[in-house]
């Protein structure tokens, strides 16, 4: 009771916060019962969830033995205000159309809003029903507020994350900075915190996906919580409160994005290995009882946690066990571990590598190698596991960020502890790195994080096409033309009619037409996703249902042209179109690409369907359930 009641028998801040959250939950229950279809219910649920998350983050800090004094709190508020200004500036200086993975969460937010409009039961049922999917709706619980107050565009969804995700994330990041400082026994705490916290906060790949309306960095809140609760904990005694927080953080990070499992497996394996090694050293020093107690408690906690996790997340676990991801996602595996190492070298950058060397120097000097060893072990194990399936995109780089944060903070400690030697050059190095990091372009094709002025200043011949595509997709100068083409389809498609767009590329795909005027999405249900990725996309029977077919010249092929399927489908269409379709409209994009819209003039025949299907005989032999079975089912339904 001492933690709840003071000497004057007054409630502690923790108790007051818990009571406030409990009262809020009761209020939500009453609103849900009395006004089940109220428009404000889901936003209120979202606000309450964000408050619970922030309260939980504070409790993690308390359990981990981390205290934020006035200086830390002031720094967090100042950096958060800077982040607000940065997002506002960065999002406002570009025209980006959210498509593909970059619109998934926005679409899920709209769908969740529609589900809650039917009542609380329908809303929560819809969220839970997605827990086995690649993209769950768990994050939508936290992002609805303040997204509901915005214009509901792609940019506003990205900006809303500064208010619903970033506060808790910064709190965890600040706590982790302090915790690593404690472990390394940093003496120059002021410079260490300022350098370390600012360095990891401005790391480009921390915010890269958020700038593209992918709130996957939400999962890092729980990753950092896991680090805070385990980095200096050795299971010498059982702490049920700590165990509950570790379990909840692990479940939450997996629900955030399934590929965070690679971090979970890599980190816990590396952590257990480190604990076994340290316990073996204790046993050699004559402390066998303590060593055995550590190992026993770890195994007991691990077995119980794994069993509970399997039960809690069984829909996701069963799908993982039944699905061959390495086969179905082979399209995204562009070179295995060798290419992944290259990506990491480019994404880390020379400046960060220099900082890491400072950290390694400090850890060797102070004979505290556990942190960098743990980080490097987790990094390599997660990388080896992930590249068995695919190579990482910019958003999947987030699963490696916890390891890099440990390495960066070790480097910040090394820099701070030696700051009095060559102080001005070191401070200039830190400031230059921050300015470099905040000016990095955050685009879908970013591999090497570079500022705008560097991208515009250097034009190597072998990267000319890559830079052209990056420029076209990052800042859409052709947005008016895309909107005009989308409007043409809206005006010409009647009730129940659909169109089909053959290109499915980073440069142009159906999502660009569907989402070019958010929050309006009049083409939803009228322009389905296209056919491009082997092992993932099914044979496109939507093409045969379509009144209009949209294609482009030249056909866009910026990603994996050797294995992409859409251009082969388009080649067959070019051969047959004069006998099956007529041209009805053209749209010049102003960048060398011209779109044409073709209207079907003859009924579909079995021979036509089989002509398209035979182009993919090799794929059909490997995935008959995705090709011939789909085609035959469509033919049977249409009496062909």
Stretch-by-stretch model annotation:
Residues 205-218, 393-394:
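Short acidic/glycine- and proline-prone juxtamembrane loop motifs at membrane-interface regions
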